[in-house]
Regions:
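An acidic/histidine-cluster motif and surrounding catalytic segment
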Residues: 1-100, 104-226
Length: 226
């Protein structure tokens, strides 16, 4: 299973940390480095369209709170990199790909074995499995109360079904469908993914407990998206 790492090239400490835990595994990995925020001018991926933005928001979130905005260069860059990773999964030989953001930190050293255990025991109909702690335990608990517990490892989550996007699995066929639908995007990465999952009626599961946490949420890194 190939791993694609969303990486802003100026954050060398994040790259070094990712390499420190991947180097102890037999993972095949690739850093997604094109379209840093300084390189997004004239890109084909993002189009600021107020009508489309509002159409996406109203289906899943409170449009009275989440008003139209032009997302910032760092957010555009991050979202493009996710799309590039999704494209690579859509065209790879293997049936499953893993996407990590460069601030993802494994909770346990044997995370590769844990991921394989998830894949081996997941419901057959999954399109994506989110494995990160994302917004934190309070958000997870609230969302899980509204979700369908499959077993002690999985919950099938209602839309919007993302929890940040620091660590998630995608099936190849699901990646193809997302890639064919997502360009041009209007929302930041995890929200745009949430909309695409909803639009394409995909089955999204959360791993219980999560296998990764987000260094920019825990305070180990400064967030670079704002």
């Amino acid at each position: 299973m190939k791993t694609y790492i969303i990486h802003y090239t100026k954050l060398e400490d994040r790259k070094n940390n990712i390499l420190s835990f991947l180097s102890n595994t037999d993972c095949d990995y690739e850093f997604i480095t094109d379209y840093d925020k300084e390189e997004i001018e004239g890109n084909k991926y993002y189009f600021a369209d107020e009508e489309k933005f509002n159409d996406k928001i109203k289906n899943l979130w409170d449009s009275r709170i989440h008003r139209f905005r032009i997302i910032n260069p760092a957010e555009i860059s991050c979202t493009i990199k996710h799309i590039l990773a999704i494209e690579k999964i859509a065209h790879q030989k293997e049936n499953i790909g893993l996407i990590l953001e460069d601030d993802a930190i494994p909770i346990e050293n044997n995370f590769v074995d844990k991921i394989q255990q998830l894949i081996d025991t997941a419901p057959d109909n999954w399109d994506s499995i989110f494995m990160g702690a994302g917004c934190g335990i309070d958000f997870m608990n609230q969302k899980l109360r509204e979700s369908r517990l499959i077993n002690e490892r999985f919950a099938q989550v209602k839309h919007p079904s993302t929890n940040c996007a620091e660590a998630y699995l995608l099936k190849k066929e699901s990646a193809k469908r997302i890639y064919d639908s997502i360009i041009p995007f209007q929302l930041v990465s995890d929200w745009e993914l949430a909309y695409q999952f909803y639009k394409l009626d995909m089955n999204v599961y959360w791993a219980i407990p999560p296998l990764f946490y987000q260094g920019s949420k825990s305070g180990e890194y400064d967030s670079t998206l704002r």
